[in-house]
C-alpha cells in the first residue's frame, strides 16, 4: 500500500480501518492521534513484523473515524472488531458477559439477583463468575441459608399470601408479614460479607450469635444459626484467599505454546480468587504477544463489565512514539537499560512458557508502600506508552474511577501471574487434543475451525405457540448459558418465514457471532435463513449449513445417530455433502441437531401448556393476556381464583369488579368452588 496523504487524516482520537481491494475491512486500530498513528506504519518498513507487512500488502485504502474521547475510540474499535472480525486483528471470540450477583438498594426489601450487566446505580455487585450454572448453585445455597425474598418486585406487590419458600423456612415473607427492616438488612449484610470473600469473619460472627442464643435457651434460633454455619463452611471450602491484604484486581498471563498463544485471566475480589478464564489463539507466535495483550484488554472490558482498580500483566510491551497498538509493537521510545532488560527477558520467557514474575521482582525491587507499586514505578521510569495510557484512561472512564495496568508488585501477585500462565497453557493443551473443529472445517469447507456453533430449530403445533430454540456449542461442548428461546405470534405454520424472522432478531441481538450456524432442516430452511441474513447485511459474516433428518419408509423423521441418510447442505450447493456414516464430524452435527430439537420442542410444549391455562381465562370477555398474567401472579391455580370470590379477584390491579364477577361466574360454573368437591382441583395445577 502506498503512503496515504497524511494531511487528510485528522489529529484527533479515533479508529482507522485498513480495507482490501474488495472493500472488506482487514484491520481495525485505535489511536490517540490518528495522523501520527497512521504515519507510524510507513516510517521504517524493515521494523515491521511479517504479519504487518502482509496486511499492508493486501490493504488498498484506509478510512478513519474520529471520536471525541479515547474511551469512545476504545469502545468503537472493540465493536468493529467484534462485528467484522478483520483478518489481521486478534479477535476475542469469547466476548460474552459474565454473570454477577446484585443486591438492589431502592426496594425496602431488596433481593439477590443474578445479572449479566453492571449498571451505574446504587446496587452492590459481586463477581464476575464465568459459569452461570455454578452461580445459580451458589444462589440456591445462599437462599437455603439466608431467608431472603426471591420473587420479582411486581409479584411482591401483588402477593396476598406467603409463597411456598416461606412455609419451607427459606423466606421471611416480607410480602405478607411485618418484617423489621433492620432484621432484613442484617441478613443482606451477612450475604454481602460472604460474596465479598469475608466468609471467615461471617462464620465467626454467626458462631458467637449461636452461642448467645443457646445460653439464652433460644434453642430454635441456635439450631437455625447452626445450619447456616454448616452451609457457609461448605461454601467457604471452595474459596481461596490469595492476597493476604485483600484487594480487587484481575491478573493476566500470556504464554506461547507449540501451536499458538494462550492467555489466562484470574478475577480476585477482596483478596479471594473468585474465578478465571483462559483463551487460545492458534497460529499466533512470539511477535504477536504484545499486540495480543493490548488487544485483549481493549476487547475484554466493555461498558457492562466489572473493571477492577488494578489489572496485573506479566510485562509492559514496548511501544512506538504514538500508541504501540499497531501489529508490529516496534519502539522508537528511549527505554532505560535496566527496564528494557527486564521487559525483553519477561517477553522472551513468554516464548519458552516459563514463569518469569520472580525475574521482574528481582530486577525492580521496590518497597510495597500504598499504591506506589513496582509496576507503576517501572511504567513511570520508562514513560507509559500511548496505548497503555489510552487503555487506562478509557477503562477509568468506564469504571468511574482510577484503573492501573501494571506489573506484579509482590510475591503473591507473582504467583497469581504464574497461575494464570499455567491455566492458559492447560487450555492450549486441551484444545490441541481436540481435533474435531479441524474435521468440521474440512468437511464443511470452512475458512477455519468453528470454535462457536449456533444451531436453531422451529417448533409449533399448527402454527400456534411457535418457538425457535437456539443452542450454542463452544469448542465442541454445549454452552447452556448462551441458549436462547425466541417466541413468535401464532401463524399458519410457515417454518421458512419464521426462520427468516428469527434471523432478523438474531442480528438485532448482536455479537458474539458464531463461526458456524446449523439449521435443523433441508435446502428450503437453509435458503430462507441465508437470504434473511443477506438482507440484513450479514451474508458473509459466518458460515451456514443445514442438516436434514433421514426419513423412514413411512415418511417420518428418523433420528438414529449415524444414519447414513442424514444429509448436510451448504448454500449454493444442490447436492448434500458426501459425509461417511459414523464419521466423527457427522455424529457431532447430529448431536447438535438433536440437542436443539429437544430444546426447541421442550420450550414449545411448556408454552403450549401455559397457553392452555391462560386461554381458559381469556375465554371470559374483557380479559386479555396482560390481565391473565396479573391474575397468575396473584393466584397459584384456577381453583384458587374460584375460591377468592369476586372481591378477591377485583383486588387484582387491572381486573375491576365487572370483569371479576364475570370471571368468578365462569370459574364457579365450570370448576366449582372449594366447597363443591375437589375433583377438578388435582387437574388445576399452577401455570407453567
Curated annotation (Swiss-Prot):
Its main location: cytoplasm. GO terms for biological process: nucleotide-excision repair; SOS response. One of its GO terms (molecular function) is DNA binding. Residues 11-90 form the GIY-YIG domain. Keywords: Cytoplasm, DNA damage, DNA excision, DNA repair, Excision nuclease, SOS response. Disulfide bonds: none annotated. The keyword DNA damage applies. Residues 200-235 form the UVR domain. The keyword Nuclease does not apply. It is found in: Cytoplasm. InterPro entries: GIY-YIG_endonuc (IPR000305), GIY-YIG_endonuc_sf (IPR035901), GIY-YIG_UvrC_Cho (IPR047296), Hlx-hairpin-Hlx_DNA-bd_motif (IPR003583), RuvA_2-like (IPR010994), UVR_dom (IPR001943), UVR_dom_sf (IPR036876), UvrABC_protein_C (IPR050066). One of its GO terms (cellular component) is cytoplasm. NCBIfam families: PRK14666.1, uvrC. Interacts with UvrB in an incision complex. Belongs to the UvrC family. The UvrABC repair system catalyzes the recognition and processing of DNA lesions. UvrC both incises the 5' and 3' sides of the lesion. The N-terminal half is responsible for the 3' incision and the C-terminal half is responsible for the 5' incision. This is UvrABC system protein C. It comes from Nitratidesulfovibrio vulgaris (strain ATCC 29579 / DSM 644 / CCUG 34227 / NCIMB 8303 / VKM B-1760 / Hildenborough). The lineage of its organism: Bacteria, Pseudomonadati, Thermodesulfobacteriota, Desulfovibrionia, Desulfovibrionales. The gene is uvrC.
Amino acid at each position: 500500500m502506498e503512503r496515504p496523504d497524511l494531511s487528510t487524516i485528522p489529529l484527533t482520537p479515533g479508529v482507522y480501518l485498513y480495507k482490501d481491494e474488495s472493500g472488506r475491512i482487514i484491520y481495525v486500530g485505535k489511536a490517540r492521534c490518528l495522523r501520527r498513528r497512521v504515519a507510524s506504519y510507513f516510517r521504517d518498513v524493515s521494523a515491521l513484523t511479517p504479519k504487518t507487512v502482509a496486511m499492508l500488502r493486501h490493504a488498498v485504502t484506509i478510512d478513519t473515524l474520529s471520536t471525541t474521547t479515547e474511551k469512545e475510540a476504545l469502545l468503537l474499535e472493540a465493536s468493529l472488531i467484534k462485528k467484522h472480525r478483520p483478518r489481521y486483528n486478534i479477535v476475542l471470540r469469547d466476548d460474552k458477559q459474565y454473570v454477577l450477583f446484585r443486591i438492589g438498594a431502592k426496594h425496602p426489601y431488596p433481593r439477590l439477583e443474578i445479572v449479566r450487566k453492571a449498571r451505574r446505580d446504587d446496587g452492590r455487585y459481586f463477581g464476575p463468575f464465568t459459569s452461570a450454572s455454578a452461580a445459580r448453585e451458589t444462589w440456591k445455597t445462599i437462599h437455603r441459608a439466608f431467608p431472603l425474598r426471591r420473587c420479582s418486585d411486581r409479584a411482591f406487590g401483588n402477593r396476598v399470601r406467603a409463597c411456598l419458600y416461606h412455609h419451607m423456612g427459606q423466606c421471611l415473607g416480607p410480602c405478607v408479614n411485618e418484617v423489621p427492616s433492620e432484621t432484613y438488612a442484617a441478613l443482606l449484610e451477612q450475604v454481602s460479607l460472604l460474596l465479598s470473600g469475608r466468609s471467615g469473619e461471617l462464620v465467626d460472627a454467626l458462631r458467637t450469635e449461636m452461642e448467645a442464643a443457646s445460653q439464652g435457651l433460644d434453642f430454635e434460633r441456635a439450631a437455625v444459626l447452626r445450619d447456616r454455619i454448616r452451609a457457609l463452611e461448605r461454601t467457604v471450602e471452595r474459596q481461596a484467599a490469595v492476597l493476604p491484604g485483600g484487594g480487587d484486581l484481575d491478573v493476566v498471563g500470556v504464554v506461547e505454546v507449540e501451536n499458538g498463544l494462550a492467555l489466562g485471566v484470574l478475577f480476585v475480589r477482596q483478596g479471594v480468587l473468585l474465578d478465571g478464564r483462559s483463551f487460545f489463539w492458534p497460529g499466533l507466535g512470539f511477535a504477536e504477544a504484545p499486540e495480543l495483550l493490548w488487544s485483549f484488554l481493549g476487547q475484554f472490558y466493555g461498558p457492562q463489565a466489572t473493571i477492577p482498580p488494578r489489572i496485573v500483566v506479566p510485562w509492559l510491551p514496548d511501544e512506538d512514539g504514538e500508541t504501540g497498538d499497531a501489529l508490529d509493537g516496534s519502539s522508537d521510545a528511549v527505554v532505560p537499560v535496566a527496564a528494557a532488560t527486564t521487559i525483553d527477558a519477561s517477553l522472551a520467557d513468554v516464548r519458552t512458557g516459563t514463569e518469569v514474575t520472580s525475574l521482574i521482582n528481582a530486577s525492580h525491587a521496590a518497597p510495597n508502600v500504598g499504591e506506589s507499586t513496582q509496576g507503576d514505578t517501572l511504567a513511570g521510569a520508562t514513560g507509559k506508552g500511548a496505548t497503555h495510557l489510552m487503555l487506562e484512561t478509557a477503562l477509568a472512564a468506564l469504571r468511574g474511577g482510577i484503573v492501573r495496568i501494571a506489573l506484579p508488585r509482590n510475591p503473591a501477585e507473582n504467583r497469581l501471574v504464574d497461575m494464570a500462565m499455567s491455566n492458559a497453557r492447560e487450555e492450549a493443551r486441551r484444545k490441541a487434543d481436540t481435533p474435531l473443529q479441524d474435521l468440521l472445517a474440512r468437511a464443511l469447507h470452512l475458512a477455519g475451525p468453528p470454535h462457536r456453533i449456533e444451531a436453531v430449530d422451529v417448533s409449533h403445533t399448527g402454527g400456534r405457540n411457535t418457538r425457535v430454540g437456539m443452542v450454542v456449542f463452544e469448542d465442541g461442548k454445549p454452552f447452556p448459558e448462551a441458549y436462547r428461546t425466541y417466541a413468535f405470534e401464532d401463524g399458519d405454520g410457515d417454518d421458512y418465514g419464521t426462520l427468516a424472522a428469527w434471523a432478523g432478531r438474531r442480528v438485532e441481538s448482536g455479537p458474539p457471532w458464531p463461526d458456524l450456524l446449523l439449521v435443523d432442516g433441508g435446502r428450503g430452511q437453509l435458503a430462507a435463513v441465508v437470504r434473511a441474513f443477506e438482507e440484513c447485511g450479514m451474508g458473509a459474516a459466518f458460515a451456514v449449513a443445514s442438516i436434514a433428518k433421514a426419513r423412514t419408509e413411512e415418511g417420518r423423521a428418523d433420528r438414529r445417530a449415524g444414519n447414513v441418510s442424514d444429509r448436510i447442505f451448504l448454500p449454493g450447493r444442490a447436492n448434500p455433502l458426501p459425509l461417511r456414516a459414523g464419521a466423527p464430524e457427522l455424529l457431532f452435527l447430529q448431536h447438535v441437531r438433536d440437542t436443539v430439537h429437544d430444546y426447541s420442542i421442550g420450550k414449545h410444549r411448556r408454552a403450549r401448556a401455559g397457553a392452555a391455562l391462560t386461554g381458559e381465562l381469556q375465554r371470559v370477555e374483557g380479559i386479555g393476556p396482560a390481565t391473565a398474567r396479573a391474575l397468575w401472579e396473584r393466584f397459584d391455580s384456577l381453583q384458587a381464583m374460584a375460591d377468592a370470590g369476586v372481591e378477591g379477584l377485583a383486588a387484582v390491579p387491572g381486573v375491576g369488579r365487572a370483569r371479576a364477577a364475570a370471571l368468578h361466574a365462569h370459574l364457579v360454573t365450570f370448576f366449582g368452588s372449594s366447597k363443591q368437591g375437589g375433583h377438578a382441583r388435582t387437574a388445576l395445577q399452577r401455570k407453567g
